[in-house]
Design a protein with these regions (language model features):
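His/Asp/Glu-enriched, well-ordered alpha-helical/loop segment
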Residues: 271-278, 320-406, 414, 423
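Divalent metal-coordination and catalytic microenvironments
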Residues: 9, 26, 31, 56, ...
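Active-site microenvironment of metallo-dependent hydrolases
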Residues: 1-24, 28-30, 39, 45, ...
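Glycine-enriched alpha-helix->loop->beta-strand junction motifs that scaffold or abut catalytic
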Residues: 240-246, 274-277, 294-303, 324-329
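Alpha-helical scaffold segments that flank or form the walls of functional sites
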Residues: 79-152, 198-211, 455-463, 467
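Metal-coordinating catalytic core of metallo-dependent amide/deamination hydrolases
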Residues: 137-284
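Active-site gating loops and adjacent loop-to-helix segments of metal-dependent hydrolytic enzymes
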Residues: 74-104, 162-190, 255-276, 298-301, ...
């Protein structure tokens, strides 16, 4: 007897043939998918403890976001109309620095709830909050929340072992002058010792990687090419190889970092021994064709944060060119205060339209490719293609049910396109992760025991953080038709 059988749905398998099974069914036993096929056959061959009727539903693999920052969700709404470093120095760093361990745990709960409600079951959390260092209470508080919620979290522990340039330090002070009321935490020459940083990452991998029934992972994450030494980069990649994990870093997000270097970030990472099939580069907005060829030749993966990059005015990553060179590109949802949501449907639609307009080519990217970038390509980007990203026997049971009986989805001429162009995320009504139902009827049952009212708790925590950080004037701003 199986644990769960899902029947009567349209199964969007994302397998090698990209098979769509009308009136399809999925059999789940434990944390694994054991069979996928037509409902008639599955009904004849299997009994189950629980049966889910997916009539008028699309059944998808759980979405994977390959680049996120979690704690900033409590700063939602404060990032509007600010370029990257204005936002980073005058909003994010002050805000996250004002958070204590409980605030971070609340943020993790809110993030997990919103992620699951829109079908996002796996996310790579870039842990790049201000101050650096290892805070055990912060980390364990977050991990406890992720475990309770039932999400699949990849904690990419960040470090910087190289001081920023004096030019950048001075520029940061100039940028901070815009907001004199803010309690700034500006960059300085304080850096981690390379070996100590690598030792910390290794100890975290040994302690936490594979916990929470395999849903918790830990990666090494050198913060940014400009503030990590070649030794730090090479050491991170070696750790990834040693522990059979991936490693990730922010790369070529804005023009400043590229213009201030003799080498491009991609060239520097290549020369330092960081590129390869275990490397996932976040952003890659300011990259050349030569950089893209290097990414392709080394099988280096890219996380595309389309909404966040545009919200910050950072630019548009040349994704169609990357795809044409066979670079694995996956979707990322990045910082919540940039896009103000945790919603892969929103990011997919934006990406699908953005590259058409930017390239003046309606065929620059397809809805199908964007759907791949949120599922099977994303699984490949995080080194989990063998276990995630598609609905196939032998893979982990991360499954999303999308209600198609909606006005906005009527008519739906072609389902893959409708899922990208006509779906907003509110149509998700059931989510399984690791074979367990983690979202149903508008609730994340695993979080019920942690917070009586998560929304009220998060709103109160956000207000307190904003006050402590001196961000009140940004919260209480007036109507703005033309930004200063």
């Amino acid at each position: 007897m199986a644990d769960v059988v899902i029947t009567n749905g349209t199964v969007v398998t994302m397998n090698d043939d990209r098979e769509l099974i009308e009136d399809g069914a999925i059999v789940v036993d434990g944390d694994e998918i054991v069979d996928v096929g037509p409902t008639d056959r599955i009904d004849e061959e299997y009994t189950a403890t629980d049966r889910i009727d997916a009539s008028d539903h699309a059944v998808l693999p759980g979405f994977i976001s390959t680049h996120v920052h979690v704690s900033g969700i409590l700063l939602r709404g404060l990032g509007n109309y600010r370029n990257l470093y204005d936002w980073l120095l005058n909003v994010k760093r002050p805000g996250t620095s004002a958070m204590d361990a409980e605030d971070h745990a609340i943020a993790a709960a809110l993030y997990s709830a919103e992620a699951l409600s829109t079908g996002l079951t796996t996310f790579v959390e870039n842990a790049t909050g201000s101050g650096g260092g290892y805070d055990a209470s912060l980390l364990e508080g977050k991990f406890d929340v992720y475990d309770a919620a039932g999400v699949r979290n990849i904690y990419a522990y960040a470090f910087a072992d190289k001081a920023p340039s004096q030019e950048f330090v001075e520029s940061a002070s100039d940028i901070a002058m815009r907001e004199p009321e803010v309690n700034h935490v500006l960059p300085d020459e304080t850096v981690a010792d390379t070996q100590e940083a690598l030792d910390t990452v290794e100890s975290l991998i040994e302690q936490y990687h594979g916990t929470a029934d395999g849903r918790q992972s830990v990666w090494p994450a050198p913060y940014l090419a400009t503030i990590v030494t070649p030794e730090g980069l090479a050491g991170a990649y070696e750790l990834a190889e040693k522990y059979d994990v991936m490693t990730t870093t922010h790369t070529a997000e804005d023009a400043y970092n590229e213009q201030s270097r003799r080498l491009s970030s991609v060239e520097y990472l290549r020369n330092a021994g960081y590129l390869g099939d275990r490397a996932l580069l976040g952003h890659c907005v300011q990259v050349s064709d030569a950089d893209i060829r290097t990414l392709a030749a080394t099988d280096t993966k890219v996380a595309h944060n389309t909404l966040a990059n545009c919200a910050l005015g950072a630019g548009i990553a040349p994704v169609p060119t990357m795809v044409n060179y066979d670079v694995t590109v996956a979707m990322g949802t990045d910082n919540v205060p940039n896009s103000d949501s945790v919603n892969m449907f929103k990011d997919m639609e934006f990406a699908a339209h953005l590259h058409k307009g930017h390239n003046r080519d309606a065929g620059a990217i397809t809805a199908e490719k964007v759907l791949e970038m949120a599922t099977i390509d994303a699984a490949r980007a995080i080194g989990r293609e063998d276990s995630l990203g598609s609905l196939e026997a032998g893979k982990l049971a991360d499954i999303v049910l999308v209600d198609l009986d909606r006005i906005s989805l009527t008519p739906r001429t072609y389902l893959p396109a409708a899922l990208v162009y006509q779906t907003t995320g509110c149509e998700v009504d059931t989510v399984l992760c690791n074979g367990e139902i983690v979202y149903e009827d508008g609730r994340v049952p695993g979080l019920d025991g942690l917070y009586d009212d998560l929304q009220s708790t998060a709103a109160e925590a956000s207000a307190n953080v904003i006050d402590r950080a001196g961000l009140g004037s940004q919260r209480d701003r007036t109507w703005t038709s033309i930004n200063e």
